[in-house]
Regions:
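C-terminal capping/lid region of NAD(P)-dependent oxidoreductase domains
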Residues: 283, 287-297, 305-325
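Glycine-rich beta-strand-centered segment in the early N-terminal region that forms part
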Residues: 21-38, 48-91
Length: 325
């Protein structure tokens, strides 16, 4: 099979298209004929540092959509021909290939009317946003929420979810993306490059601060998130933990860390099954046209290194998806 290969940890420019044997599913696993994969920042980060459990050459790619091609022993909930998608285990071979292996219990079904590219765009960014907005932050209609990086994958999904709930959404984005994030549901867009973000948020909220923050950029913006949280506010972070001062706890603020890699590496089956449950809930929203998967670019397998290099600039709007079929 054709696959995008990495011979050793290094820059995305070292990725190349090569040949590998078609893998066979083990007990509790299925083989998927890959139709589409989406690109995520975690892909270039993993390429750069590697993983002690990888076998070389390694195949990256965590967000996969395709058709069940073979079923391993005990994976009887799936049949060949089923349309599926999943968020993969970063310690194992991924989906930047014509065929991929995944665990049956972490896999979700693609409903009629949803394409493979749309499904592939969901897992990493969509599940992160869902976990933060719905599970951890419990965003309510009367909340004011700061969703950082609203033009990106995680931020874009989160902006839409909060707007659908009825919350007022403030987001940060470059000026060229202001109309875009407002089209997703943001009430206010702040130019992080040319405005004092903290001062602008406090102006918008009349000094009160926001009820919820999703820190999706870096540790510095996570620190800003703590700074603008109102009394009993909550922050969820995927970008590193903020510095926590005593005042954080004096104001009864809470901090939540989102990390999906742990669901696989912890051997916590309940958490792994939950990946599939959340994926089913997310793709139902896409099927209902309640959530837009925000596909901005569709590329081929050989274009993935260039796509990942784009992601490294942190100036990509929405999602990049590679179609293999």
């Amino acid at each position: 099979m054709k696959a995008l290969l990495l011979d050793k940890a290094g820059p995305v420019s070292s990725l190349y298209v090569g040949d590998l044997p078609v893998p066979e599913p083990g007990a509790g696993e299925i083989r998927v004929k890959v139709h589409a994969v989406s690109l995520n920042p975690v892909d270039y980060k993993l390429a750069g540092r590697g993983n002690e459990n990888w076998k070389w050459p390694h195949v990256l790619g965590l967000d996969v959509a395709g058709v069940v091609d073979a079923v391993g022993e005990g994976a009887n909930q799936w049949s060949t021909g089923d349309r599926v998608f999943y968020h993969g285990d970063l310690s194992k071979a991924g989906g930047f290939a014509e065929y991929a292996i995944t665990t049956a219990h972490t896999t979700a079904r693609i409903p009629d009317g949803v394409g493979f590219a749309e499904a592939a765009a969901i897992p990493c960014a969509g599940l992160t946003a869902y976990e933060a907005v719905v599970r951890r932050l419990n965003v309510q209609p009367d909340h004011i929420v700061w969703m950082q990086g609203g033009a990106g994958g995680v931020g874009g999904f989160a902006v839409q979810m909060c707007a659908n709930i009825g919350a007022a959404v403030i987001t940060t984005a470059s000026e060229r993306n202001h109309e875009y994030v407002k089209s997703l549901g943001a009430s206010y867009a702040i130019d992080y490059a040319n405005e004092d973000v903290v001062a602008r948020i406090m102006e918008i909220t009349k000094g009160r601060g926001v009820d919820r923050v999703l820190a999706a950029v870096d540790e510095a913006t996570a620190d800003q998130g703590i700074e603008v949280l109102a009394f009993r506010g909550g922050l969820a972070t995927v970008a590193g933990l903020p510095q926590l001062a005593e005042s954080t706890f004096d104001n009864a603020r809470s901090v939540h860390r989102i990390a999906y890699g742990g669901a696989h590496t912890s051997s916590n089956r309940e958490a792994q099954v939950d990946l599939a449950l959340m994926a089913e809930e997310m793709i139902a929203l896409v099927a209902e046209k309640t959530i837009d998967p925000m596909i901005e670019q569709v590329i081929g397998l050989g274009d993935i290194p260039a796509g990942l290099a784009q992601l490294e600039t942190r100036h990509v709007r929405g999602k990049i998806v590679a179609e293999l079929v």
